[in-house]
Amino acid sequence: KMLATRALRPLASLATRRPLSQLVVSVVGPDRGGLVSSVTRAIAQHDGNVVESSSFSIGPVFSMAMLVEAGADQHAALTSAVQSAVPGHSVSAHEAEECVEAPAFAAALDVSCADGVGLIARVTEFVANEGLSLSKLETKTEGAPHGGTQLFSLSGVMLSKDRVNEAKLARGFKDLELEMGVNIDMCVYDDAEAVKMAA
């Protein structure tokens, strides 16, 4: 009888296990030591598992985004616990779609030029007008090797759920180069790489 009871316990445990779903949790605020530890401890205490994360600091401000897997009924409590763990920071959470559709088009975008006002706005406006979205974007400004001019660079990944006329897009970027006096490089990913970019 004891053996039968023990054998049934794992089955009972499986039957009561909560369904899992994914949540994107973002934390933004002043950088300080132990911040990541405080956030991840709060998540773990609510049986959350950090599947993927990305963090960076700009000046004194720290930003972190995490894809968290947790019980579907734990999302509100988990978000509240993270906010309590870092009361001086802005915490937001959004339900994540479990299935990300593979894009029909994906390409890397690199822009470099002398720094100037409105560069990011103009480039991203062109990308949006072409029906593309930017899944990743990084910009920076640094001094030229021999001093004087500030150099600007932008790197990103463009995605589209629809097929794109690559020749037309390339011509558009060439026109933008001439208009703005910038260097623009576009590298189209193959299908396998496109799936990775969307993940």
Task: Give residue spans per PLM region.
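A conserved regulatory-domain signal marking ACT and ACT-like small-molecule sensing domains
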Residues: 4-5, 14-199
